[in-house]
Amino acid sequence: MNIEDSCISCIDTDWSYQLARRMEKEKTNPVLGYRTAGSAAETATGDMLYREMKAIGLTDVTRDTFSLDGWEFEKAVLKFTDDDGQEHTFQMGGYQTNFETDGFEDYELVYLGKGTAADYEGINVKGKLVMVEINQRDEWWISFPVYQAYLRGAAALIAVQANGYGEIAESALNAQDIAGPDFAPAFSLSQADARILKRSLRNKISACEDNTTDSEDTHNTLEQDAALLRRSSLKVSLDARSRVIPDTTAGNITGKIQGTETDSMILLSAHYDSYFDGFQDDNAAVAMMLGIARSLVKGGYKPAHTLVFCAMAAEEWGIIDSKYDWSTGAYNQVFRVHPDWQGKVIADLNFELPAHAHNRQDAIRCTYEYADFIRQFTDSLTVPKEAYPDGITVLSPIETWSDDFSMAIAGIPSTVNDFSAGPFMQNYYHSQYDNQDVYQEAVYQFHHECYLKLIMAIDRLVLPPMNFSNTMNAVAESIHENALSFADPEQNVLLRNLQTITASAENIYDKICQINAEYALSLIHISE
């Protein structure tokens, strides 16, 4: 049995699955979960992962601390008694804003459609709760209606996902980074609970207008509802505690398998903060990363380059009032805690939502420069049909959704198992339905094996397999797409220069491949 087969035989996806479930233990909200930036729950989970890395046999295990803004979301419970005397209790999700009551406090609640400026015309919302329906995927982010409500004097905004996210069930809540100030509070309410409130508003208006309104009409458009239901309000009670903590600390947990030949590093990363239970996002990813580390140690692998395993804090959010408030832990790790990683880390393999098939075809998304090498690697794989019937492909460039972007802008070639284009995002992502029920063992097993093999493939290289001609071709394509933005002489000069650079980059990549092939051959001779 060769070393690759030996390590693969040590993969235990049940061990990884159980670790992912154990990560759910610590939570800021005892009902909904949440393991948020700088919170006690995140810190305790980091401590557990620190101990786990040591138990696996990783060396130089550290907690790399950094400054950020934290968030503790303990509860947001809305109570309402309808005209029949039935009391309803709604669990609401939270956003990274400040709002704290002294037990249940009474408020007026109004419904204002999409929460646009036009929806507020003629309505006094000062001190009230404003309920709106938004679609963050196709229209606008939560930050816009929240700030609109704040400017109008509302006590808080309650956002209902009309579509875009949380589509799996009408009871789904949603959470996202607020991308705004902490003093404009917001909460998340499910469509099912919002429907109860809207029905009561409709009944109240119907009674006041001598039954001229059809109280049973639930087929109105959002605009029709906004025009009708804004005429009245409801009495509700809210018990909430959401606290933003400026300038606190968090820690990225790192461990190593020391390299034997170079001071270069191969980085594996995944984040351990979460919304709700966060089983796929990103418990399963952290657990897979450590499951791979465990297999390499148990299998006796001695890497040429040092393997670094990093559980990142604060990926979901970590900065007050910023458009760039996510991937805080990764950004701090590579720019402030370990700027020395720039130039030493030859690849970052980042993991997100890896125990679920997001499409019939799997994909590794990577920076332009690594696309050729990754494609050559995927061509060598046998993909199990029960995991991905249509095999695997390679996509580039990377996107801004995940921590590999922070690594890439620091100059580290990065990859991630592609997750952003599938239906999981519209249905389960950042909702309480991201739990163990969406676990797919065949996918998880394949990803353990695939990325263990990719680590070894990269580790066998003496030079990073970077083909800059892909980058130059992408630049040229963007020029053609935006041709009218350039004067013709400037465009032609730029394109000619790009052709020259592209040819040079292809020659350099050919030489890199030649040297890597000769090095791989020498390793075979040594082993013999």
Please give the residue ranges for each predicted region:
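Second-shell loop/turn segments in exported
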Residues: 3-10, 30-40, 111, 133-139, ...
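Acidic/histidine-rich catalytic neighborhood of metal-dependent amide-processing enzymes
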Residues: 137-148, 249-252, 274-369
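Noncatalytic luminal/extracellular "stalk/propeptide" segments of secretory-pathway proteins
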Residues: 10-14, 18-21, 25-126
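Extracellular/luminal Protease-associated
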Residues: 37, 90-188, 390-393
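Conserved small/polar residues in nucleotide/adenosyl-binding loops
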Residues: 2, 524-528
